[in-house]
Amino acid sequence: EPDETIADFLDRNHFGRSFRENYFLPMIGAIWSCSVEQMLEFPIQTMVRFCHNHGLLQIQNRPQWLTIQGGSREYVKRIVRALEESHVTIKRENVLCVNAAQNGVSAEVISASGVASFDEVVMACHSDQALTLLHGIDQEAQNILAAIPYQKNRAILHTDTDFLPMTKRCWAAWNYTAQSDTVPTSKQHVSVNYLINRLQPLPKALQDTQIIVSLNPSSEPKPKLVQQEIQYSHPVFDMKAIQAQKALPLIQGSSSIWYCGAWT
């Protein structure tokens, strides 16, 4: 069934509690950074397609994941360089609102420095941000943007190894943490501890130190071992969001407004 949820699929096929709570839900929650309750409402078809595309359904010959030297900032630099070489002007300022084109009037971007008119405007931001910034879009576009919500997730960079499994040989790249009383209807966000040493080529000076990123930690790392705290926002792909994604092409280019981002 294309609209079947993960909860319905697990119930229909009589998967046991141990499989759900000790393997399946932790894995899915770690991937999508959401609560158990939200996971169970995900479309099973979307989940299976994602796992297939990322080589997660096979036991052997899984794809080798690679990282970019220097991190994501390196490809951002290259994009900026390519734009500048093509004589594209890059301004770094906050956009206050965007007026969609209507009645023969071009789309307008309003920022602190004034108003600028454009033939086309690309909203390369989160769906909720686009909905807040845009003025003059039709009801269909508003409904699609509103149907793809974002949620905040807290990440802490630290070196507190108490957040890794007690048995060192069990240390993995992704380490899921759950309270002993966690139940499938929990609204708590999933807690995952990423061991960066297994994910990124760290400098030699750091290779003997366990670098950890804890997402939505259930407890706090020792303050002296904390390096940085960051708030991230991630899209929530429930059934309504998946349906809205399918309808997104209907509004691309409408009123000279285009959309792109992790949610599209």
Question: Where are the language model's segments positioned?
Answer:
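A residue-level signal for conserved active-site and pocket-lining positions in enzyme catalytic cores
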Residues: 10, 28, 79, 122, ...
